Amino acid sequence: MSPFLYLVLLVLGLHATIHCASPEGKVTACHSSQPNATLYKMSSINADFAFNLYRRFTVETPDKNIFFSPVSISAALVMLSFGACCSTQTEIVETLGFNLTDTPMVEIQHGFQHLICSLNFPKKELELQIGNALFIGKHLKPLAKFLNDVKTLYETEVFSTDFSNISAAKQEINSHVEMQTKGKVVGLIQDLKPNTIMVLVNYIHFKAQWANPFDPSKTEDSSSFLIDKTTTVQVPMMHQMEQYYHLVDMELNCTVLQMDYSKNALALFVLPKEGQMESVEAAMSSKTLKKWNRLLQKGWVDLFVPKFSISATYDLGATLLKMGIQHAYSENADFSGLTEDNGLKLSNAAHKAVLHIGEKGTEAAAVPEVELSDQPENTFLHPIIQIDRSFMLLILERSTRSILFLGKVVNPTEA
């Protein structure tokens, strides 16, 4: 039986209040080494992969909440490609949307190095960190080049792990995950195959403050949210009158609202008209995002947004197979760039994401009072955006235009 490589893609996404400390982790000078054009090219390719993966999830889990981190999944798969060769490597990068004729492998790998470095660069009032950890079996002999690449290019932590003791290995990995997510994710890995010899963990941690925080006293404790034509649930509904970038896309029959975080990140709420969700999902692409970015206009909005928490866990194995990554799971997998040992193949790719949207995120934080003089007198003249039915949500990092998180909220009461 072939030894297994286990890929874990862990995401912790939080909307919280202001956090002034700089993110932990190594800071490197990455902003001058990569042309902006390359980053924008990569962000477009990554966005199209994100929407392709999203559409797979809608087929596999229809009428369910969807939430995941595209940049986390892409970065982990590119890191895995460091150790892959021949068709195994080609399938991985082509599934991500790259054409090796147009974009050589070295450009892809260095592009992601710069992307991760840019995302990890400390930003006051925004805590954003993407990281990797590699747990390698004590008897596996990884190639020096592979270890050097993942350490220097991706700042990956590497641990020597005794996988002959499954219980101890799970404890070691879960303890590391719990520590990196500040205790938010406990017991991520419940089982490991007996012949597992390597586990790759990728995580992204995000905390930010709304640029225009909501006043908790204006949150309605119970408001109707439409799940389908006949079913509603009750959710807390936040409310404010504020200026936001927004638009009505007449072609796609949806309303788009941009809510900025205080520093270098933004959230896009996409609210289709009733019965139009599938057509909007089918049209989502990097070109759609660029169109909206051009057309968004700032103006006063009477805004109602649900307060909610959702999480999602995915076994990406079957999904990645359908998308084109097949050799990595087969007996013919070629990971000779990782080790000289024969027979290594990918056994599983797991992904977990968690999100909380609220007025302030932590009880200790204060929300500024809303000055009445800053609001328009004739509120009835301004559009009402009431997010009270299924919607899509995107969270993007501004400087790289990377989609940090992507999802659909069908039922905000299903945590």
Swiss-Prot record:
Result, substituting residue 351 to Y: Quebec; partial thyroxine-binding globulin deficiency
GO MF annotations in UniProt: serine-type endopeptidase inhibitor activity
Annotated positions binding thyroxine: 293, 398
Keyword annotations: Glycoprotein, Secreted, Signal
Record annotation: effect of changing residue 383 to L: Kumamoto; partial thyroxine-binding globulin deficiency
CDD domains registered for this protein in UniProt: serpinA7_TBG
Highest taxon, organism lineage: Eukaryota
The keyword Ligase belongs to this UniProt entry's keyword annotation: no
One Pfam family it belongs to: Serpin
Compartment annotation: Secreted
Biological process, per Gene Ontology: thyroid hormone transport
Recorded consequence of changing residue 211 to T: TBG-A/Aborigine
Glycosylation sites: 36, 99, 116, 165, 253
Annotated InterPro entries: Serpin_CS (IPR023795), Serpin_dom (IPR023796), Serpin_fam (IPR000215), Serpin_sf (IPR036186), Serpin_sf_1 (IPR042178), Serpin_sf_2 (IPR042185)
Signal sequence bounds: 1-20
Tissues of expression: Expressed by the liver and secreted in plasma.
Cellular component, GO, one term: extracellular exosome
Family (UniProt): Belongs to the serpin family.
Function: Major thyroid hormone transport protein in serum.
Protein name, entry field: Thyroxine-binding globulin
Native organism: Homo sapiens (Human)
Gene responsible for this protein: SERPINA7
